[in-house]
Amino acid sequence: MARKKASIDFEQSLADLQALVERLENGELSLEDSLAAFEQGIALTRDCQGALAQAEQKVQILLERDGELAAQPFDAEPEA
């Protein structure tokens, strides 16, 4: 259950960050609101980066073989 919650937290943080960027790009926020949104965006970015770093560590652990790390590049497109 903790894994699913972490995934949901990452996905929600990313969605919140995207919404903040859209609001900032609209240019309709006051200076004060823009600064608050920017500050919140920085916090969300740090949360997302932390979650990604944790996921990368877990992948490296899973790829570990015979006490050595077998680093393999991630291929986003499956071979046909």
Swiss-Prot record:
| Gene Ontology biological process | DNA catabolic process
EC number(s) per UniProt? 3.1.11.6
Q: What is its main location?
A: cytoplasm
GO-annotated cellular components: cytosol; exodeoxyribonuclease VII complex
Alphabetical UniProt keywords: Cytoplasm, Exonuclease, Hydrolase, Nuclease
Enumerate the InterPro entries for this protein.
Exonuc_VII_S, Exonuc_VII_ssu_sf
Kindly list the places in or outside the cell where this protein is found, as annotated in its UniProt entry: Cytoplasm
Q: What class of enzyme is it?
A: hydrolase
Q: Any keyword Nuclease?
A: yes
Q: Tell me, what is one Gene Ontology molecular-function annotation carried by this entry?
A: exodeoxyribonuclease VII activity
Q: Which reaction does it catalyse?
A: Exonucleolytic cleavage in either 5'- to 3'- or 3'- to 5'-direction to yield nucleoside 5'-phosphates
Q: What does this protein do?
A: Bidirectionally degrades single-stranded DNA into large acid-insoluble oligonucleotides, which are then degraded further into small acid-soluble oligonucleotides.
- Per the similarity annotation, which family is this? Belongs to the XseB family.
Summarize subunit and interaction data from the UniProt record for this chain. Answer: Heterooligomer composed of large and small subunits.
* Name used for this protein in its record: Exodeoxyribonuclease 7 small subunit
Source species of the chain: Pseudomonas putida (strain W619)
